Amino acid sequence: MSIVRRDFRSELSGEKGESMNTVLEKIRKMGIVPVVVIENEKDAVPLADALCNGGLACAEVTFRTAAAGEAIRLMKEAHPEMLVGAGTVLTVDQVDRAVQAGAEFIVSPGFDPEIVDYCIKKKIPVLPG
């Protein structure tokens, strides 16, 4: 068995949004990415307001609730400058729904080759856990 290391960061830039390097640089500058679970989309904008007003214009919205996609959309609509990603992404369908909602990066809880390859192909920054 051989292990192949692949640095895919340079492959992730294009028309879909920011490059992987740009997203990672923004995260590095923030120092922390709050991981949030939003059960009700009405909580999304007040949360985004609080994060941005507190100097932390970044969030990873977990895709474990039915409200996640709409929450991402509302957060990006209220704060276009905010870096918003989708976390706990388990399927390619969730990748598509998250990106359509405005997610700028994808986080998966483990390394799923299907999700990573799909994101690379679609030029979506992905952080497999």
Per-range role (PLM):
Residues 67, 93, 99, 104-129:
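Conserved anion-binding
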Residues 6-19:
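Short, Lys/Arg-enriched N-terminal segments with co-localized hydrophobic residues
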Residues 19-101:
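Conserved N-terminal beta1-alpha1 strand-loop-helix module at the mouth
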